[in-house]
Amino acid sequence: MAKGSKKKAGKVRWGIISTANIGVEKVIPGMLKSNKFEVRAIASRELPTAKKWAKKLGIPVAYGSYEELIDDPEIDAIYNPLPNHLHVPLTLKAAKKGKHVLCEKPIGLSAAEAEKLEAAPNGVIVAEAFMVRHHPQWIKARDIVRKGKLGTLRAVQVLFSYYNDDPANVRNMADIGGGAAYDIGCYAIVSGRYFFNAEPTAVVSLIDRDPVFHTDRTTSALVDFGEGRHLTFTVGTQMVSYQRVNVLGTKGRIEIAIPFNAPQSGAMRIYLDNGRDLGDASAKTIKLPKADQYQLEAEAFTRAIEGKEPLEFGLEDAIKQMRVIDAVFRSEKSRAWEKV
């Protein structure tokens, strides 16, 4: 469990550093649905941009620099969706000011960099923003696994892709942490760690890099979790948009059709299959209530700040996640299995 904190009376007040798309289009709208905390401020490198989004989203305070928001004594928690190379520096800066930080994934560019966040003051919570672990479909799927309905778990298979060849997009900038492994491979890795409830021992990967961007545009890996448990995944930034998670055991299989970008407009479904038919005839559809995973994520983080409920996944978990990504990149160079 992640270390917790005890906040004084009054709602937790959030600040958002950056007007990145994921924040203003997904995370902040989800947060604004909640009455469990306040979204007090938003910051951008340019004040007019911050003011524009503050007005559009109904956020009271706008800042023209990240440092101004971090220094605001009225802010208790910060959400950091900055480009990947700024995750650790700005998260650490905020933590040293006593702010709790929910940082977008990946939490850093390497495990060594992520470990710098261990310098956060005692009682300050730092966590990686894997919103999927708060969605009812993931929680239900894991509950099915833990109850043994799939038998002995053997494999987790993940596909996740989209098409983006825009040279101005941060996902295509190698020097600041662009590429498939950082952007969406992290979801595949967390899928294996979540459902196996274990840490992998070794990785072998195959990576194809864009000849112009030098980012990994297709990354595939086989991840060994020991005891006959395998995670296999392919992720890509220049493929048709698609996502799927399959969890397979000796007695059954779970399929999550929209595992990562679950829509908020309607109920979600996962499929439980006993494998008696090669098609889907034997599959049972399990309907889950509609939910905003970003809202649920922020509420869980807020409860941890308030001392009401410890986070299940904190900084230690984020560092373990980065160790797997490190091994994926080492295997690309060695063309061999790499220990995690």
Placement of each model-derived feature along the sequence:
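C-terminal helix-rich "cap/oligomerization" subdomain common to oxidoreductases
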Residues: 1-11, 77-79, 286, 300-340
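N-terminal Rossmann-like dinucleotide-binding module
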Residues: 1-57, 302
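Hydrophobic residues in well-ordered beta-strands that form the structural core
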Residues: 23, 63, 80, 102-103, ...
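Short, conserved SAM-binding/catalytic segment
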Residues: 52-59, 117-122
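Conserved SAM-binding strand-loop segment of SAM-dependent methyltransferases
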Residues: 59-66
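Beta-strand-loop-alpha-helix segment that lines the small-molecule cofactor/substrate pocket
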Residues: 77, 83-133, 148
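Predominantly a Rossmann-like dinucleotide-binding segment in NAD(P)-dependent oxidoreductases
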Residues: 124, 132-212, 335
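NAD(P)-dinucleotide binding in Rossmann-like oxidoreductases
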Residues: 209-216, 226-297, 314
